Amino acid sequence: LTNRFVAYAGAVLLLQGLAGCSDEKKPGNETTGPVTAASEPVNGAAEIADRKLVVAFGDSLYAGYGVLPQESFPARLEKALAARGVAATVRNAGVSGDTTSAGLRRLAFTLDGLDRTPDLVMVNLGGNDMLRGIDPAETRANLTAICAELQRRGIPILLTGMVAAPNMGRDYAEPFNAIYADLAKRYDAALYPFFLDGVVTNRALMLPDGVHPNPQGIEAIVEKVTPIVAGALEP
């Protein structure tokens, strides 16, 4: 695993240097923003009711940092599901810079603002915690609270996990990397272990910052994640 993510370590070192002037939000002052549809609204109440509702709840990797809205992960996922015959609306609830703490604070607001209960909530948080060196125990506690709230509301979960870069050290990486599989088992959630798998180490699939995927990288991720989402939406 370490050999596969050597380039990831370099990207993390770069971003850690930028973290102090990034879009990190102060407690109580985070930008929640509206939950937006990944594509054009569907016409007709009956047609809307027949479609599955997926909420992509996460950070910049879901929000679509550095790409056009129609190139974002939620937008491309919706298109890919349609190509498989799965009628679904994928709502983009990604906020760039979000840590697990910020995500937890806005979770209820996000869910309560929806027209109906989602058929699936995808969660991708923790990358910014790792970049800022936040204690993995805190990250685990926040993600546990997020999963517990989704379970309390009867909403199925799909976790798209993150992996600590090798330069974070073994003492950090081991507890951090175990979080997503542990929570998937505890909350009977679907799991894609590493959102950037096969992408973050390929410069052709990444933006110049080396941290966020470009449109081609997003397509590569969507290709891998779509079958898992489709399976999670099956009755």
How would you label these PLM feature ranges?
Residues L1-F57, V67-L68, A82-V86, D115-T117, ...:
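N-terminal secretory targeting modules
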Residues V55-A63, A93, L125:
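Acidic/histidine-rich, surface-exposed loop or edge segments in extracytoplasmic proteins
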Residues V86, L104-P235:
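Alpha-helical cap/lid subdomain in secreted, periplasmic
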